[in-house]
A protein has these predicted regions:
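Ribosome large-subunit tunnel/peptidyl-transferase-proximal elements
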Residues: 1-78, 103-113
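Strongly charged
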Residues: 81-113
């Protein structure tokens, strides 16, 4: 049975919809290739996904003694985090709701067999 190496980023300040665009680019790829791809992807979410993926690779090397060349992305998800809600008061007694969306990013790596 293969060992799962995990890393998570909670309450990332980018919406899950925007993070999923980046996550779909790297799903199933080798970890080293995915890190290179994320480094040159012009999206704000790519920075956060790169950070989590680099952390997962470091966990694999430090805690499990696995070479980074043998790792691939087994599972990567971007889920919704709690939304911060507040309002801006408008004319005639109305208000306009503001939603600040966040996301949780989870990366699971496995070793190639």
């Amino acid at each position: 049975m293969a060992t799962d190496i995990r890393a998570e980023l909670k309450n990332c300040g980018v919406s899950a919809q925007k993070v999923r665009l980046v996550v779909d680019l790297v799903r199933g790829k080798p970890a080293v290739q995915a890190l290179d791809l994320l480094k040159f992807t012009p999206k704000v979410a790519a920075f956060h996904v790169h950070k989590v993926l680099a952390s997962a690779v470091a966990n694999a090397e430090e805690n499990f003694g696995v070479s980074r060349d043998e790792l691939y992305i087994y599972r990567i998800t971007a889920d919704e985090a709690p939304t911060r809600k507040w309002r801006i008061f408008g004319a005639r007694g109305r208000f306009k709701p503001l939603l600040r969306r966040a996301s949780h990013i989870t990366v699971v790596l496995r070793e190639r067999e």
